Amino acid sequence: MRVAELTEPLASHPSALAAPDASAGMAAMEKRVAEYHARAEAFARALRKPPFHAETVHRLRTHLRRLQAYAEFLQHPIVAARLAQSVTWLSRLRTLDVFYHYLRRRKAPAKDLRRVAWALKEEAMMVASTGRLEAIRSMLAKMTLARIRRPVAFVENRLAALRGETSEHLAAALRKLSPEATRKELHRLRLLVKSLRYKEEIALETAWADPHRMMAFKRLQRTLGDYCDRDQFRRLAKKMNLACRSEIKKEYRQYHEKAREAVRKLGPPEEPASDLR
């Protein structure tokens, strides 16, 4: 996969041959986002008291990220920031849960499993006792589609600009990477790719859609996500002084190289970002 796969002309895709209809596009987007919102509310309601189901936490965070991407697309920075904060509130809970199940699959020593299980239990109790889930439910109840809706002409302009903005943001991010991309650089790139993918996903049923590019972003997000997970596991293992930390560190290095290789295959592009259309 190269930058061209993520920035090639929209006309190369069959969906682009249809005459754009802004009203229909807006209706399709709102239908999709309404489903995201309904699911986010359902998952938030399901998380009442510990122990929390891991998949429910994961899906809630995913749909909050999708709603954040929609708020960014409609240029509602305050709403987007609140949604991003909600995701952050649940980040450590999600990480510890994924780490615990990762250790179980690796048949880690019982002592290591107990330490992580205890940390997970404490984090779940903290999330429950600080009212974070209540705050998320309240925020979602107030964040109706009607309150953040934009005029049809505004949405049409945003859809028309989506390709150019995506190309510019991706190209700029790649040019900022050091020759051997660092942990922080890869983490920032992953968050950007995730946001770009969700924006593409939201527009999937419109005449501006590009399924090919959306799937390319999804593959890149998965590669970077696998690496970022191993990075978090490595740091947790060191902090908790787990017996299996050396094995985790070795695996981390392997995933770090995979992520770097994926980025090297992308570019960086030689052309100015404004030319990547």
What are these model-predicted stretches?
Residues M1-R277:
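Function-determining surface determinants
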